[in-house]
Amino acid sequence: AGDRTIFAFSEDYIADENRPTLGLSFKTALGELITEFRPYQKRLMPYFSNLLPEGHMRTYLAERAGVNPEREFFLLQALGADLPGAISIRQADGAGGTADLPDDSIDNESDRTSSGSQALRFSLAGVQLKFSAIQEARGGLTIPARGVGGSWIVKLQSQHFDHVPENEYSMMTLARMIGMDVPAIELVPVESIANLPTEMLTTKGPALAVERFDRLPNNGAVHIEDFAQVFGVYPADKYG
């Protein structure tokens, strides 16, 4: 009720000896499946909280969806069509979107009427402004409709620190030069990225395009789990 959430595995999942692993945090030290979890208030349990964006990106996507950014259950419901790794979130009855969000999860009347048409249905964890993008056969990158899909990540300039994309590009290039395995990267003009939301075109400087390691050429996805999820650490606590 309200902002109180409880996670539970389905009985079929629990009974399946060949079930896929959702995350190491759902197993005991001996590898047994944990099946009882405490309730959480407002925030989700750390595993799911770490699937959500942080900082300005979180605020931006929440505003587009008309959802209070602090109410994580409703935010995950709004963004859950395309999450990091191979996880997706949908309502138990198979319905999707924010049409069935309770009124008190939405900030105001204008957000309530616009949330369906304005929302972007994706999430990329972290604080940096970034979007998933499609590499077009003719060349160039396109932000897909609703933000869902794409095998590249486009990272925009930071609002707080100068030249973050250029710095990351330099570090990745140096890593490749010393023999480390790094993904394909490219610095691209922001204005060359098709379908990027117009409010992002004011960004000064190039964006960094990085090929996603959690996406496959056949539109498949690779299941991933970061250390914050493994150890049950909330995003705000992982930086220090």
What are these regions (language model features)?
Residues 1-240:
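Phosphate/dinucleotide-binding and metal-coordinating scaffold of catalytic cores
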